[in-house]
């Protein structure tokens, strides 16, 4: 969390307030909820070798947390520059997808836990089917029903090869009584901040509330600029123009919206 900053607006009667809660704080809270759902599903099991497919947006957090319960964690991503998110940790090794496939062909990887966070258009079911883990978990990217998203999704094709030979779980994330098109961490971050902004605007004395959001994926995947990405998501989540000091109410509204997010793993 940052510290709420108050400045004057056009006149001294109008104040401009930035929330203490930053964009990254919302993202981190969502990551914690998703990881806790995975941890509950694993029921305290420990693993020799874990493979996590997908660094963005919370694979790195998952790797760090699971490294406490595993001898080795491979964090695999199709984008080489994603290595910049991975801390120096002897138990976590980043591999781009081609490097990982080469290690697999050589028989150098044999995970007993696989976590697939790649979502829509992610890792191919045919490649996943070559493994024999004790546990397989895949993140279901779907949120509220959308015909095109449902047609593009292949979550259950990815789980099919493991149903008879492993413990299989599908990670699902929704917002209670709210609409989000996908369960993606960025989708949920944006929807949470936008909805909170609308609620803050309804407070007495508030002129407007602006979500401080950017096209973050453009910064990351088009510019490949991790430092700029991290700088942008470290900005206050919402800026408020107001006659009154509504910072505490704004923080409570943000917190309530974050608390609407619910993650669980459905066992197949």
Curated annotation (Swiss-Prot):
It comes from the Archaea. Transmembrane segments: none annotated. InterPro entries: HcgC (IPR009573). This is Uncharacterized protein MJ0489. It comes from Methanocaldococcus jannaschii (strain ATCC 43067 / DSM 2661 / JAL-1 / JCM 10045 / NBRC 100440) (Methanococcus jannaschii).
């Amino acid at each position: 969390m940052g510290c709420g900053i108050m400045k004057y607006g056009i006149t001294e009667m109008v104040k401009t307030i930035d929330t203490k809660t930053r964009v990254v704080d919302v993202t981190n809270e969502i990551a914690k909820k998703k990881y806790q759902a995975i941890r509950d599903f694993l029921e305290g099991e420990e693993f020799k070798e874990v493979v996590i497919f997908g660094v963005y947006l919370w694979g790195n957090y998952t790797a760090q947390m699971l490294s406490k319960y595993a001898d080795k964690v491979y964090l695999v991503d199709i984008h080489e520059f994603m290595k910049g998110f991975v801390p120096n940790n002897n138990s976590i090794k980043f591999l781009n997808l081609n490097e990982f496939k080469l290690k697999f062909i050589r028989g150098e990887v044999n995970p007993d836990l696989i976590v697939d966070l790649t979502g829509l258009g992610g890792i191919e079911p045919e490649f996943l089917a070559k493994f024999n883990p004790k546990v397989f978990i895949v993140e279901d990217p779907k949120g509220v029903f959308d015909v095109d998203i449902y047609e593009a999704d292949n979550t259950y094709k990815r789980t099919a090869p493991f149903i008879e030979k492993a413990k299989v779980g599908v990670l699902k994330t929704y917002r209670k009584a709210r609409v989000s098109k996908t369960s993606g961490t960025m989708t949920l971050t944006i929807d949470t901040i936008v909805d909170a902004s609308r609620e803050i605007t309804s407070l007495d004395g508030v002129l407007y509330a602006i979500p401080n959001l950017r096209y973050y994926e453009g910064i990351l995947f088009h510019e490949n600029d991790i430092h700029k990405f991290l700088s942008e998501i470290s900005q206050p989540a919402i800026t408020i123009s107001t006659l009154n000091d509504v910072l505490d109410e704004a923080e409570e509204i943000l917190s309530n919206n974050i608390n609407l997010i619910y993650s669980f793993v459905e066992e197949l």
